[in-house]
Amino acid sequence: MTRIVHDGDGDTRILATDVRVADSFFARARGLMFRRSFPDGSALVFPFGRPASRTLHMVGVPFDIDAVWLRGGRVEQVSRLSAWTGLGRAVADTVIELPAGAADGVREGDTVRVDDG
């Protein structure tokens, strides 16, 4: 079972257990667009392989999300993106999208990892 794990301030917390990986061009381009919901415990992971400026937009996404930009497993930025109009950008090699509120308590410099079990 793949899960998203947050290590910060001496605590370890599971952020998601229903994890999907956007590992193709089409999956990365679609992201969460046109989905009707994003249940608690879900995550969408965008692995890019190397750090670069990564932009997320919320066009076609009808719900708020939390986005976590990672570089080498360290949190570079955490943002709450608003439905339809949200926009976020940071340098990262991995970006994780979570339901709004799931990344509460995640801070820059913390560790977040995709754990295969």
For every predicted segment, state its role.
Residues 1-117:
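Compact, glycine-rich, soluble single-domain proteins
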